[in-house]
Curated annotation (Swiss-Prot):
Protein name per UniProt: Protein-export protein SecB
Example GO BP: protein transport
Quaternary data: Homotetramer, a dimer of dimers. One homotetramer interacts with 1 SecA dimer.
Main localization, broad class: cytoplasm
Subcellular location(s) per record: Cytoplasm
Protein species of origin: Paracoccus denitrificans (strain Pd 1222)
Composition bias type Low complexity, residue spans: 8-22
Keywords: Chaperone, Cytoplasm, Protein transport, Translocation, Transport
UniProt lineage: Bacteria, Pseudomonadati, Pseudomonadota, Alphaproteobacteria, Rhodobacterales
Amino acid sequence: MSDENNSGAAAPEAQNPGQNAAQPAVRLQILTQYIRDLSFENAVAQKGLPSGEVQPEISVQVSLDARKRPAEHQYEVISKFRVQSSNATDKSPLFLCELDYGGIFHVEGVPEDQLHPFLMIECPRMMFPFVRRIVSDMTRDGGFPPFNMDPVDFVALYRQEIARRTQAQRPADQPLS
């Protein structure tokens, strides 16, 4: 029976035993996650129910920040979400939800030139399901249907931020290439 499942090919580790030895294994551990700042404003409750039909229009803005902590191999990553809903017909505000969600990560084995993208892409990606649940619960608890955010493309967000920083460093009279 064991001969039927064995095709005779060696396992990838056995074929190239020294290939992975030069590159250390990446070690990532979430030490803690927490709400750093949280705000929910229900404009409907403050102004009263809008007249006519309400067609909600929702915008989501995301920004990220990462910094080294005093402890070795520890980094703090902050994801900032601003979720704003307004009535599509008259642009009147419905709610505003702001959440700064943080995580402290222990990261080892990531090459220095890849550490910043790793912190700004992989760490927020790991925290996102928790952010999504908090925003969903907040909108529901605020008197609205739960808002389940679509997944965020953190790679595209990182590339946009790098492009923005590059553009900001370029002198105004220098042409774009």
